């Protein structure tokens, strides 16, 4: 998984893909039901995954919030994830009886169809707060592909010793991925440049470019795209939608 994740850093959209996500992978969403401020109803979560299938998305990272206000325990999230993944695979099997879904990541054997279940993974979106620092010290984290940590800050101000904390993350063997940097309007170009020089990866929210978070964030997103600073794209979905997932 780690080597695969390294490869997709520079992977282009698959030929013939109808998905608006560059590599058919959503690296950031809140679809796992009932664990944060995202989806609450498992049926709505299943409906969203069906929309993902139809949109050409092929892989999804569930990244529920972990922060002092939402102190999710990794082990509890793993239990919820495994239970929901089983529900999804059962739902897929009912919709595609010609396929035999099997395996921990939804691998399948197909006879007369190209239908494939989504590959589902669990990580977390970590607020850089005191809870995170304690869990970083204890090694109690949910990384993407073993070595990448999706992190965020307040949209109003960075944490104290922000870059020092990022360096401590790296010293623990992780590469930080900063979620939606376009939303941190306290940052200036030199701040972004310093983070990139530090080896921090950037994840763009799909809907930032479409104005979902306001004109200032949209403008900042365009600037970061122009500066070629983004490494990943995620939806950051919290509610059911089909808008903008398939390429026009």
What is each of the regions a protein language model found here?
Residues 53, 170, 225-226:
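Non-catalytic positions within long, well-ordered alpha-helices that form the structural scaffold/packing
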Residues 2, 71-99, 103-202:
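Extended substrate/RNA-proximal surfaces in nucleic-acid metabolism proteins
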Residues 188-195, 213-222, 227, 240-248:
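Histidine/acidic-residue-rich catalytic or RNA/ligand-binding cores of hydrolases
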Residues 57, 229-230:
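A structural motif
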Residues 28, 180, 236:
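Conserved, mostly hydrophobic/aromatic
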Residues 65, 230-245:
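Short acidic/histidine-rich active-site segments
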Residues 201-211:
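His/Asp/Glu-enriched short active-site or ligand-binding loop at hydrolase and phosphoryl-transfer sites
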Residues 1-95, 99, 106, 110-115:
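An N-terminally biased module of ancient metal coordination in phosphate/nucleic-acid-related enzymes
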């Amino acid at each position: 998984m780690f080597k695969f994740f390294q490869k997709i850093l520079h992977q282009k959209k698959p030929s013939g893909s109808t998905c608006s996500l560059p590599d058919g992978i959503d690296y950031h969403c809140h679809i796992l039901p009932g664990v944060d401020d995202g989806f609450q109803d498992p049926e709505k979560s299943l409906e969203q995954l069906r929309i993902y299938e139809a949109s050409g998305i092929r892989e999804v990272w569930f990244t529920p919030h972990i922060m002092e206000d939402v102190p999710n325990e990794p082990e509890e999230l793993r239990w919820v994830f495994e239970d929901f993944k089983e529900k999804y695979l059962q739902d897929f099997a009912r919709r595609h009886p010609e396929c035999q879904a099997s395996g921990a990541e939804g691998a399948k054997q197909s006879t007369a169809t190209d239908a494939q279940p989504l590959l589902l993974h669990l990580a977390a979106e970590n607020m850089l707060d005191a809870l995170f620092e304690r869990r970083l010290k204890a090694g109690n984290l949910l990384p993407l592909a073993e070595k990448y940590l999706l992190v965020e800050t307040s949209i109003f101000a960075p944490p104290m010793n922000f870059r020092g904390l990022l360096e401590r993350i790296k010293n623990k063997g992780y590469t930080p991925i900063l979620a939606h940097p376009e939303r941190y309007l306290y940052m200036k170009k030199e701040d972004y440049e310093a983070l990139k020089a530090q080896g921090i990866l950037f994840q763009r929210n799909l809907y930032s470019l479409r104005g979902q978070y306001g004109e200032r964030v949209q403008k900042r997103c365009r600037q970061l795209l122009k500066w070629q600073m983004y490494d990943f794209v995620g939806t950051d979905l919290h509610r059911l939608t089909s808008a903008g997932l398939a390429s026009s």
